[in-house]
Structure formats: C-alpha cells, structure tokens
UniProtKB/Swiss-Prot annotation:
Belongs to the universal ribosomal protein uS2 family. The keyword Ribosomal protein applies. HAMAP family: Ribosomal_uS2_B. GO terms for cellular component: cytosolic small ribosomal subunit. GO terms for molecular function: structural constituent of ribosome. This is Small ribosomal subunit protein uS2. It comes from Herminiimonas arsenicoxydans. One of its GO terms (biological process) is translation. It comes from the Bacteria. InterPro entries: Ribosomal_uS2, Ribosomal_uS2_bac/mit/plastid, Ribosomal_uS2_CS, Ribosomal_uS2_flav_dom_sf.
Amino acid sequence: MSVTMREMLEAGVHFGHQTRFWNPKMAPYIFGHRNRIHIVNLEKTLGMYQEAMKYIKQLSSNRGTVLFVGTKRQARETIAAEAARAGMPYVDQRWLGGMLTNFKTIKTSIKRLKELEALVEDGSMEKLSKKEALMFEREKIKLEKSIGGIKDMGGIPDAIFVVDVGYHKGAITEAAKLGIPVIGVVDTNHSPEGVAYIIPGNDDSSKAIMLYARGVADAILEGRASATNDLVESIKGGDDFVEVNEQA
C-alpha cells in the first residue's frame, strides 16, 4: 500500500493535460505548467492518495465492498486483474446505465449469466442443437463482457474506485444518488465534484493507472488481513481457563 513520491514521478502521475483544457476546479492541486502541460502537485497527491488508501483499508476491515471502475483501453486489463486479486467486483468494458440505481434489473441479467454458465458446466449445452448452443454461447459471451466482473456482487457496493472521473460521469452520478462514496483519479481537465476521496493525477498513463489500482487492491487485502488478525487476537483473549465443578 505504501507509495513514495519517487514512484509517482516514475509512473508519470504528475503529468496533467494541456493547459487549454484545464478545469479551474483542479487549480488547488496544480503545481504549475511546462510546455503547455499542467503539472500536478505531487505533495498534495501523495497525501490525498494516502488518505484514500486509509479509508479503503478501514472499509475492507469491516468487510466492505469496493467496486473497481475503469473502462478506458489502457485501464481495462489492470482494473480487472487488481480487482480480481483483491476479490472485488469490477467494470472494465462499459458502464451500463442503472448498474447501481437499477441493480434489481442488473441482478436479473446476472442470474441469466449464471444459468448459462451452469449449462456449460453440467454438459447440458452439448445436448442442444448446434443452432441453440451457438445462440446461448453468444448470449453468454455478451453477458460476460458487460457484467462478468460484477456477477458475484451480491448488492450495492460500499464504495467505488474510479479511474478517470470524466470518462465515468454516469457511475459517479449514480453513486451520488445512492450516497456511495467515490474514490476517484481526477486529472487536470476534469471536475472533482462528486468525488469523496480525490486522487489528483494522470489518468491516461498505464503506469500511473497500475500504481493507483495496485494501491487500492493492496489496501483492501491489508484491511482484510488486519480484521482476521483482530479476530484471532480476540478469540485468544477470550480463551480463559474455566474450572468445571463436576459435583455440581
């Protein structure tokens, strides 16, 4: 979970967008500009990143769920891999409208996906005609692509982690309606509004995206481990010897 300013520099976290595309609401997090590119103040980014990771760790220690969201080409693989490593749901292809606000409908699609997966696992698909099998296979692939990352998400997540808030305005709007905290990477060309835990920085570099996502996954795993350790300690502490009077 620990990240240094040098690691942020090496990942290019400090590189913002062209100055002409800037969002004035990001002014407090901008150090200056070089060659018409805004430079993010990494002293602020590091502190805000650490605050966000602290929150995620605490949430995870209380068995909270964090939904990873990153559908940009350079983010997809990393988001899926790090979410899977942390045992968390993710959206890596396309944000479907209503994924949070209309989760009942999404659950119907998840149920259908699991039914199709069961057909494959128990061999039932092989008993169908070629035409039917092909139709079901296409349906399964389509559902896997759109909701495969959230098929084990039992309900609304406790928080969402978003790479590139401008690219995922729909997700942030839905989270706001439901009061779900957003941990978001916000570049110099976007607004930080609606983001509870802002991580000011580059949202285009694959190295930077890896740094953020790996940090979130590490924080989740650390939180889960600390909760397990606390449970073990509490069990040990309550394991006092009690003498039983057999004559009673």
